[in-house]
C-alpha cells in the first residue's frame, strides 16, 4: 500500500531513523506499548466533572456555564470521528497524532491562563477551547486504536480490547494523581486548574513525541505491503523500505480508487445504518445514566448520599472492556458468531434500567450499586464489541471511517437522552433550599420514572433492530 504525500513527509525522517537504528521486533513491540499509553492519556478528558467546583468558586461559572463547556467537549469528541477516520484512512494515523498535539497544548494553556487570571474575559473562547480539547481527545484515542488495529488485525484482544481498556483506566488513574497536594491551591484548598491544565499541556507534548514515532511505524507497515506485521515478526531490518525510490511510495490513483470503492460500499450497506441506530439508542442511554448518576443517587437516597456508584461504574466498565476482548478472541478461535455478545449487552442494559425504576420505590443503595455495575459492564462491553465487529465486517482499511461514522450515534444519543432527562427532572422533580441552614428538600424519586421508562423502550428498540438485522444478514450472523 502506498503513502499519501502528507503521510510520506510527516513520517519520512522517523521511518529512516527507526529503520536504521532498531530491529523490527523492537519497533513493533514499542509501537504497541506507546499506543496503549496513548489510550490511557486520551481518557483524561473524562475527568471533566471534577472541574465544576473550582470553576464555580474561582471564575464564578454558573451551572449552565459548566454544562455548556461539558457539551462543547462532548460534541467535539463525538461529532468529529467520521472526519478523523477519513483523514486516518487517507493519510495514516500520524495525521491524528499531529491534530491531537495542535488541539491539546494551545487549548489547555489558554484555559490555564484564564483560571490563573481569576476571571474569564471571553467565555465563548473557553467553550471553543473545550470543543477543541474534545476533538483532540478523539484524535489521540483514534490514533491509538487504529495503530493497534493495524498492528494486530487478527486478534481483537490486542487490537481493540487492550486500547479500550486503557482508555477506561485513564479516569481512575487520573483522579488519583490529581489528589496530590501539588495540584491543589494552598490558600483555598480546591483543585488548582491553572496547575492541572499546564501539566496537561506539558504531558500531551510528551505524548505527541511518542505517538509521532509509533504512527510512523504504521507507514512502514504499509510500505512492507503487510497488514499483519506479526507475520514477518522475525524480519531483521526495515532498511530497504526507506531506501526505495521515494517517487514510487506515493499513493497511486489505483489504490485511491479501491479505497473510495470500499468507502462507498460501507455507506451503501444497510448493516452500517442498523449499527448506527443501535449505537445511538444504546450508548445514548448509557451516557445519560453516566452523566446523571450523582443526581439520580441524590434523588433516590437523598442529599449527602454516597457516590461510590461512580467508582463501581468505572471499574466494571474497565473490566468489561478486557473481558469482552477476551471473549471476542475465543469466539473467533471457536468460529462462533460474535453478534450474540451485542444482544447480551443490550439485555443487560435493559435489566439495569428495570432495576433503577424498582430502586425508586425502595430506598436501598444496593439496587443503585447493582444497576451501576451492570450499566458500567454494558457501557464498556459495547465500546469494545462494536469496534471489533466493525473491524471484522468492513476491514482495517476503512476502519477509521466506519467506526468514526458509528461514533455519531453516541454524540446525538447522549445529547437527546441527556436533554430528555433534564426536561423530565426540571418539570417533575423539585430541589429547593428553604434556608441556608436547612437541608435540601427533594421530591419523590418517582418523578424521574418517565425518563427511564423511555430509555428502557429505546433499549428494547435497539435490541429488536439487532435481532432483525441478524436474522436478515448471513454476513452478520457469521461476523
Curated annotation (Swiss-Prot):
Record GO terms (molecular function): transmembrane transporter activity
Residues carrying a glycan: 29, 295, 364
- What is any Pfam family matched here? MFS_1
- Its main localization is membrane
Keywords (A to Z) from UniProt: Glycoprotein, Membrane, Transmembrane, Transmembrane helix, Transport, Vacuole
Membrane topology recorded in Swiss-Prot or TrEMBL:
Multi-pass membrane protein
- Segments spanning the bilayer are 32-52, 68-88, 95-115, 127-147, 158-178, 193-213, 266-286, 309-328, 339-359, 368-388, 398-418, 448-468
Localization per Swiss-Prot or TrEMBL:
Vacuole membrane
GO cellular component terms, semicolon-separated: fungal-type vacuole membrane
Protein family = Belongs to the major facilitator superfamily.
What exactly does this protein do?
A: Probable transporter.
Which protein, by its recorded name, is this?
Answer: Probable transporter MCH1
Originating species? Kluyveromyces lactis (strain ATCC 8585 / CBS 2359 / DSM 70799 / NBRC 1267 / NRRL Y-1140 / WM37) (Yeast)
- Please state the gene responsible for encoding this protein: MCH1
Amino acid at each position: 500500500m502506498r503513502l499519501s504525500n502528507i503521510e510520506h513527509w510527516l513520517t519520512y525522517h522517523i521511518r529512516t531513523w527507526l529503520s536504521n537504528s532498531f530491529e523490527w521486533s523492537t519497533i513493533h513491540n514499542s509501537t504497541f506499548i506507546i499506543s496503549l499509553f496513548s489510550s490511557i492519556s486520551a481518557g483524561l478528558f473524562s475527568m471533566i466533572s471534577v472541574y465544576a467546583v473550582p470553576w464555580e468558586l474561582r471564575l464564578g461559572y454558573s451551572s449552565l456555564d459548566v454544562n455548556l463547556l461539558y457539551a462543547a467537549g462532548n460534541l467535539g469528541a463525538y461529532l468529529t470521528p467520521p472526519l478523523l477516520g477519513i483523514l486516518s484512512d487517507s493519510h495514516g494515523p500520524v495525521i491524528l497524532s499531529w491534530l491531537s498535539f495542535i488541539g491539546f497544548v494551545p487549548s489547555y494553556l489558554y484555559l490555564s491562563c484564564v483560571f490563573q487570571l481569576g476571571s474569564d474575559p471571553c467565555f465563548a473562547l473557553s467553550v471553543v477551547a473545550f470543543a477543541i480539547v474534545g476533538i483532540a481527545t478523539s484524535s489521540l484515542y483514534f490514533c491509538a486504536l487504529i495503530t493497534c488495529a493495524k498492528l494486530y488485525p487478527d486478534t481483537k484482544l490486542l487490537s481493540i480490547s487492550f486500547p479500550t481498556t486503557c482508555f477506561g483506566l485513564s479516569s481512575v488513574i487520573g483522579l488519583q494523581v490529581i489528589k496530590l497536594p501539588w495540584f491543589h491551591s494552598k490558600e483555598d484548598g480546591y483543585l488548582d486548574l491553572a496547575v492541572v491544565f499546564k501539566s496537561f499541556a506539558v504531558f500531551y507534548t510528551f505524548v505527541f513525541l511518542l505517538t509521532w514515532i509509533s504512527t510512523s511505524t504504521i507507514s512502514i507497515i504499509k510500505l512492507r505491503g503487510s497488514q499483519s506485521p506479526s507475520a514477518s515478526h522475525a524480519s531483521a531490518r526495515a532498511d530497504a523500505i526507506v531506501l526505495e525510490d521515494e517517487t514510487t511510495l506515493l499513493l497511486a490513483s489505483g489504490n485511491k480508487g479501491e479505497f473510495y470503492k470500499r468507502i462507498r460500499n460501507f455507506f451503501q450497506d444497510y448493516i452500517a445504518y442498523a449499527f448506527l441506530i443501535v449505537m445511538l439508542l444504546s450508548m445514548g442511554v448509557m451516557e445519560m445514566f453516566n452523566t446523571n448518576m450523582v443526581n439520580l443517587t441524590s434523588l433516590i437516597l437523598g442529599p449527602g448520599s454516597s457516590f461510590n456508584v461512580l467508582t463501581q461504574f468505572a471499574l466494571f466498565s474497565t473490566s468489561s472492556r478486557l473481558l469482552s476482548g477476551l471473549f471476542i478472541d475465543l469466539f473467533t478461535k471457536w468460529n462462533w458468531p460474535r453478534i450474540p455478545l451485542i444482544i447480551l449487552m443490550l439485555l443487560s442494559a435493559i435489566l439495569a434500567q428495570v432495576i433503577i425504576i424498582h430502586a425508586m420505590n425502595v430506598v436501598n443503595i444496593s439496587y443503585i450499586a447493582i444497576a451501576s455495575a451492570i450499566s458500567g459492564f454494558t457501557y464498556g462491553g459495547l465500546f469494545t464489541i462494536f469496534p471489533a465487529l466493525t473491524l471484522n465486517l468492513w476491514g482495517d482499511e476503512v476502519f477509521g471511517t466506519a467506526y468514526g461514522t458509528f461514533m455519531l450515534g453516541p454524540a446525538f444519543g447522549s445529547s437527546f437522552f441527556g436533554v430528555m432527562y433534564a426536561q423530565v427532572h426540571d418539570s417533575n422533580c423539585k430541589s429547593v433550599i428553604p434556608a441556608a441552614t436547612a437541608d435540601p428538600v427533594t421530591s419523590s424519586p418517582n418523578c424521574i420514572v418517565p425518563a427511564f421508562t423511555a430509555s428502557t423502550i429505546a433499549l428494547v428498540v435497539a435490541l429488536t433492530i439487532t435481532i432483525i438485522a441478524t436474522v436478515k444478514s448471513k454476513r452478520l450472523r457469521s461476523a
